[in-house]
Amino acid sequence: MNTNIFEELSQKKQSLISLTQKAKDYGWITPQKEEEIINRIKNDVLTIGVIGQMKSGKSTFLNAFVFEDDVLPAATTPMTAALSIITYGEKKEIEAEFYTPQEWEEQKMQASRSLEDVKGNEIEESKVKAAKELMEKAHKLGSSLESFLGKNQKDTFENLEEYVGADGKYISITKAVKIYYPKEYLKGVEIVDTPGFNDPIVSREERTKEFLEKADAVLLMLYAGRPFDSTDRSILFENVGKCGIGKVIIGINKYDIAYENGDTIEEINEYVKQQIKDAAKNYGNETLSDLLKETSPIPLSAEMARR
């Protein structure tokens, strides 16, 4: 397996410390947060958030580079996708965190609203659609549903699909799932696979932001076929920036597609770096450009890693 990405992340510890200090100097994070992050880096506890828009290949990447198998499903919709936390364990097992009774009541209220009433309001329409989808999938639990709310549930690794699969029994009430996996390079590492930003499930989006704020590094996955488009720019500058943009690492996924079309790795990297620089200027914040200039995109290919 090609584990260069995690080796490179480990080698970037000193760089992360420097970037964290700069992030504090520019006011992106507090001195207390700076000290917390640096202590965690020095103590070999590395939390990596993996983000990216739909179709950027996050699940395929994690399956190839972490699990070496098709573990995480790629077909789950943004409406029902749970936050996944991957870390080391002596054996393969999972622990699911379910929505609280209060959070579930909020979803029931959203689901009771008419789509016609929110027509034209994209954000509210998304919330209502998500809630209705959750309620529809919740029928699988029947009258036992309420007994799970507010609880954590451990289960065998073989049942992971029941919590993260599109048709899983518990997908409707699962806010996050922790996956324990016996890989040496996961020792002292916590990889957080996020559903994304602008999440229609407010409580889940808050959990995503919470994890990204404590992350030592954030791996932003770009698709080589359309690297750093308007959606990527929004994710980086409007969302990740609030969590401390100095800790961002850019990964260009599926670069082999562009490579086969005649582009070299160097050309792809230079293109992305220039796009980031131009976007930082367009956002009118030179400090962003300064923080990101030390970020060198890492070419990734889940498909090539499996060959």
Predicted feature descriptions by range:
Residues 1-26:
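Charged, amphipathic alpha-helical linker segments immediately N-terminal to NTP-binding catalytic cores
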